[in-house]
């Protein structure tokens, strides 16, 4: 489950929403240079995601337990671990418009100055939203 929260940047004063985490059926990656986000659907990833689910000790998400159990029992492909999943999934994405790459381990950035989360504080006037 992902979330979106409002922040204020200490470095430049920009108010913005930052998203983190994917959902039950998609992953959310950030650009390693500017922090823009890119969603990638598990269906789009096809065999990459199926191989990852096959290698998990349990379901990817409780809400898709039955589907994941079927994948683990019936999918004929070789399982992959999390690191390989991330590497293969990242390779399917085009570069960001800024020239950076979308990565699972890249952090969100302030859209005003590209500062990292340690430079922000929660905006008391903004909402906090969870999504799947």
Task: Show the residue positions of the predicted features.
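Cysteine-rich micro-motifs
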Residues: 24-37, 106-116
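Short, intrinsically disordered terminal segments enriched in charged and Pro/Gly residues
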Residues: 5, 21-22, 37-92, 119-132
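Cys/His-rich microdomains that often coordinate metals
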Residues: 15-17, 37-38, 100-104, 116-119
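Residues immediately within or flanking Cys/His clusters that coordinate Zn2+
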Residues: 4-6, 26-28, 90-95, 99, ...
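General detector of N-terminal leader/presequence modules that precede the first folded domain
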Residues: 1-24, 28-31
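A general structural-boundary detector
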Residues: 18-21, 83, 97-100
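Short cysteine-rich clusters marking metal-coordination/redox-active sites
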Residues: 9-12, 31-34, 94-98, 110-113
